[in-house]
Amino acid sequence: MEVILKQDVEKLGHQGDVVKVAEGYGRNYLLPKKLAIEATAANKAVIEQMKAAAVRRIAREKTDAESLAKQFDGVTVTFTRRAGESNQLFGSVTTSDIATELEHKGFKLDRRKLSLVEPIKTTGDFKVALKLHRDVTVDIPVHVAKEAEVAAQ
């Protein structure tokens, strides 16, 4: 089944793309959630108009994302956690923790925009990618320290 995406769908395509999907995926997920429409000749003409508007919107969003990215310069997120002798954390630091800490610093964002392959389970310095726009990604430094080390300082 061919569908036209009405908005970006992760791992499938961007708004306005004509993609081939399984019948069930199209009829049971994409169409009911209004993420896509069937690829007919009439719909393709409508999508061309939507693409023109989308190009302007995407340019504006990219500009906004770039200005927001500049605000993240010099921002470091620091966590103190209990850890064992081998610097293994009792627990972990997740994207949710990082998003909450960034919110305390005045940045309101969705935790799903943070890219962390797996939760941080050791002390040290890490980089977490924050995807503000499909063309704008910022690396945020994350420092995880042992509770005893912080108390000693």
Curated annotation (Swiss-Prot):
Entries under Gene3D superfamilies matching the protein: Ribosomal protein L9, C-terminal domain, Ribosomal protein L9, N-terminal domain
Known function: Binds to the 23S rRNA.
Keywords, sorted A to Z: Ribonucleoprotein, Ribosomal protein, RNA-binding, rRNA-binding
Protein name: Large ribosomal subunit protein bL9
NCBIfam families: L9 (TIGR00158)
Pfam family, any one: Ribosomal_L9_C
Domain of life of the source: Bacteria
GO cellular component, as recorded: ribonucleoprotein complex; ribosome
GO molecular function: rRNA binding; structural constituent of ribosome
GO biological process, one term: translation
InterPro entries registered for this protein in UniProt: Ribosomal_bL9, Ribosomal_bL9/RNase_H1_N, Ribosomal_bL9_bac/chp, Ribosomal_bL9_C, Ribosomal_bL9_C_sf, Ribosomal_bL9_N, Ribosomal_bL9_N_sf
